[in-house]
Structures are given as structure tokens and as C-alpha cells.
Amino acid sequence: MEGPFISVEKKGAQDERNIITCNEEVCRRFLDASKGLVKYVGIAPERNEDAVSFIRAMKDKVNISLAHTNAGYDKAMEAFQAGANHAVHLYNAMPAFTHRAPGVVGAVCDSEHVDVELICDGVHIHPSMVRATFKMMGADRMILISDSMRATGMPDGQYTLGGLDVNAVSYTHL
């Protein structure tokens, strides 16, 4: 699940009305309702004063992912050291990876237990960055995803995504 404990600033196509802070009871209800189908829960640790406690409480019940987050390097490292073990669609819906502010990407590089997703559609991430990420992380940590939506392969036009209206133009709907 990419959320609902994510950042409003990095929400992407997520419906802002459904974004909430980390809540163990809500998370347990999701897990119980899914009868074991939910394997990952995405959080933005910077939105939650006590994200570390949430991660420690939930990490043995579900994989904790950093997703749709505006976390800097230190906050991401704190989450990974507490037990988060996954990063959702690396480079997308998170701060840029730079030499002075490595952000989530830098924290992932420094946390060998963390697996990463990459959207490999040739649009979300340049092919050179895909190759560089394989070199940085190693193939064993990589999960390649499409992140496609209902409009994939369809002509430009109006579509819906999670109940939201989307105007899909050109490559934006891959």
C-alpha cells in the first residue's frame, strides 16, 4: 500500500483527502481487513513525530516502505535504522538525489537491508539512472515496476486514477 501515511507535498496521484499521519490502530485494521494480502505499508517519516515508534511497532507485521516522502537523508536513515526496509519507486515522489542533500536515495545507498523499486518505463527515470542504480544497489536489491494506470496504451484523454480525474497526455500515462 502506498500510504495512507504519506506526504501531501509528494502525494503524486494520491487523493489528498485520504492522507493521514502514521497510526498503529489504522494500520492494524488495514492488515486485518486484508487477511494477510497487504505486505507493504508506505510512510513519509517526516510527517510523523513518532515515525520510529510506528516502524518498530509494525515492522514485524508488515514491511515498512518509504513512499511519497519529502524526508531528508537523516530522517530516512532514522526510519531505515528503526526497521523500514523498502523504498517505493526510487527517485519519484521524493527529494532529488544531490551531492549536498542525498535525501532518501542516499539513505537507501547506506542501508544495505533496504530493497528499492524502480519505474522502468523510460519516462519516469532516464535509462542511465536505471543502470547507475543497479551499480549502486546491486541487482539483489532491485524491484522493477511499471507504475502504470488505466490509461496505459490508450489515446490521450480523460481517465480516472483512484477516483481522481486525470488528463493523460503523451507519455504521462505510461
Give short role names for the model-derived ranges.
Residues 3, 89, 168:
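Active-site donor-binding loop signature of nucleotide-sugar glycosyltransferases
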Residues 25, 32-156:
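Active-site core of metal-dependent hydrolases
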Residues 153, 164-166:
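Anionic-ligand binding region
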Residues 158-163:
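Short, surface-exposed, charged loop/turn segments at secondary-structure junctions
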